[in-house]
Amino acid sequence: MMKLSISNIAWNVADDDKVAELLVSLNVSYIDTAPGKYFSDIKNVKNEEIIKVRQWWQDRNIQFAGMQSLLFGTSGLNLFEIQTQQPMLHHLEKVCHIGSLLGATRLVFGSPKNRDRSKLDDNSTKDIALDFFNKLGNIAKSEGVIICLEANPVCYGTNFLTTTKETAEFVKELNHKNIRLQLDMGTVYTNHEDFSDIDKYAELIGHIHLSESNLAKFNSEQLSNDQFHIKCGEEFKNLFSNSLLKTDIATIEMLIKDASSTDDYLQSISSAVEASRKIYGVEN
């Protein structure tokens, strides 16, 4: 059975108590997080601080599944610039450690601004990227986590790994057990990708984001009438029922920009959970 998670980028940390109560009532037992949500100083965060956050959620019968926004708060880091690779890997090593202690073992590498290949030809781009992600994969392995590479559409300012197919082919060529494919439904939607092709890459998928373009709210009423999501939902159910997926968690990823109160957050979260179950068949 596919399990449901929701990323806490959707609400303010100050509302954790009420959101946790809601998630329990909805039988949602997982959340994803961004490290900056709880730790303002990634470099110097102590183990006990990380464990405290994990325990707080465990006490409410909720576990961490994954992390995103791995490079949020950094500046000047680009995997294609040799002089910034080592500082970038050092930062990501700490993030992998945080993920490991939280139990958030699926780390989503999106970060379009940190993978700018604009000065490089195709061969140099591939060589540098393969070397960088092999090193990052080894770091992830040492911490018992996986890095999930996310395709980011061109409209987000990305010029490397912009489609699901391209990203899947890169992951396959890299061939590192701790580097997997991140399946992002917002990317599939934005790029108008043929979701029926996803079964070709299903075994590479390490994590899944149920999302809309630009992280718009995952609204039950709206998605119920969206033929693209309905079609993708049917394909998604087939992937899982045929045991083609190697991951068993799908995460709602959205921003709630128009919320003026805690109740607004809670209502949007409830609607997103309903949509995920109705359209994508994610049960709990």
Features from the language model and the residues they span:
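Structural motif corresponding to the early beta-alpha repeats
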Residues: 29, 33-127, 244-251, 256-258
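Histidine-acidic metal/acid-base catalytic patches
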Residues: 1-5, 13-27, 58, 89, ...
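Conserved short-loop catalytic and cofactor-binding motifs
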Residues: 7, 41, 83, 155-158, ...
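Catalytic-core regions built around general acid/base machinery
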Residues: 49-59, 132-140, 197, 235-239
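Active-site-proximal loop/turn and secondary-structure-junction residues that shape catalytic pockets
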Residues: 10-12, 35-37, 70-73, 113-115, ...
